[in-house]
């Protein structure tokens, strides 16, 4: 492990905006998940995304209701909350990917 590995994620589930958008568009079962707060979501989001506030007390219960047949593409403002949320999804057996850099990294 070199000194830069902690600064630059090299995980197969952490994707740049172009790659994540491409995988989502090519997926026949993909779900975009905005894990920001409701006010953030209502202000601006990626069209078609659902909102699941990672910081809400009910987040874990919402996650447990998700369809295991779907693939989840998770994002937030900067990539921190979504990285943690995507990890939670994977821990319960869901397929999920994190948008590195957050909503601003999504290509328009």
PLM feature spans:
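Flexible, polar/low-complexity N-terminal or interdomain linker segments that lie immediately upstream
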Residues: 1-43
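Conserved beta-strand scaffold positions in the cores of enzyme catalytic domains, especially
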Residues: 14, 32, 49-51, 96-98
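Short amphipathic alpha-helix with an adjacent loop that forms part of the alpha/beta core around
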Residues: 21-24, 59-68
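Short active-site oxyanion
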Residues: 27-32, 48, 70-72
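Conserved protein kinase catalytic core
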Residues: 40, 59, 104-108
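Short loop/helix-cap segments at secondary-structure boundaries that form the rim of catalytic
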Residues: 41-47, 89
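Catalytic cysteine-centered active loop of the rhodanese-like fold, especially the PTP/DSP P-loop
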Residues: 52, 64-107
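Glycine-rich, highly charged phosphate/nucleotide-binding loops
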Residues: 52-58
